[in-house]
Amino acid sequence: MAPNPPDRPPHSNWRDLPNWPTRRTVLEYTGATATLATLGLLGGSAAAQDDDEVGADDTDEDDGETATDDGPAYSYWLPDDPRELEFVAVDWVTLNEYASDELEDAQPDDDVPAEFEADPMIAPVSEGALSAYLFVGLDLAQFGLGRLLDDGEMFDSTVSELLQTPDTYVVLGDIDPAEIDERLTAEPAAEFIRQLEQTDEIDGYEVYTPVEDAAGTAIAVGDDALVVVDDEAVDALAVLESMIGAARGTADRAVDDSESFAWALETAGGGDVVIGQLGAPAGSAAAADDGDRLVDFAYPELEGAETIVSSLTIEDEETSTGNFAAVIDDPDETALADVLGASGTDQSVDVDGSRVTATATWDEEDVAVARKM
């Protein structure tokens, strides 16, 4: 079981206590800059040491989705947004098998090597993975779904992938709509639990909204996905329609409207944890104005990048690889080579006009040495 948050009394269900801290507080507490390489390659879970190689199959057996030449399956859920787009995508099957213990046991005093924090291919992806993981325990707890990732202990529904954007959270997998309905519509068992009721339907998904009117909150439930919107600043139903429409092919997708984004996804979007942005350039005034961004690529070397996709893939119990793709106005190849994948080995950085690609590898031995320095 994960440790209690600081300054909180011991409680067996501390994730579900009413005065739960903000996502930012918890990210800081769990060490948001702890890298996936550190989480996975140091003290890897026993599950990761099975004979079966983790992450070797791109086919998702749980929900039947398969990455195609047109892009990874999660990309179908990313609608064309006239503003900007940020996302975090997690192959939960792989991450759960490999690093679930490390995700839960991360401590605030974990020493993270400075070179990891300074590497755009490591820190942002790691923060994204933790954000997606913690969203379920934090944000979904208010709907009675806070333990959805707990390996069948509380739910018959199973999770294969997680997708987070600033407006929405998508749980992909084998979902039992009746089970979710029972949780959402149940009489609240605690003060902080919000009761919902079925009020609408969108393209085969049953839509639930709070019994007590709350702007910006709606949950769509289907047998292959659970789509959550909980942001009072948006029209929740419109957001659901846009995202479900993209997934069903009845609304425009970001990948279809942007050649640079499609290229970046094809190049670097196939990892076990993937983050990306399309829109406000990294380091721009528009990006700086948003102090709570989902994806943080605020590195001087990436200033002016309008499209970025970065991913980490778990190859086995000892090795992770990273892939990076960006479209940057007037990129500085020397400066980029100093940071992209610099904390790993087998580093490669290539600049072709405005297109930048990079790859690197992180091995258990290298990570262990870095943490001792």
Task: Walk through the language-model features, giving the residues of each.
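Soluble, non-membrane globular domain cores that form compact, hydrophobic packing
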Residues: 2-167, 172-373
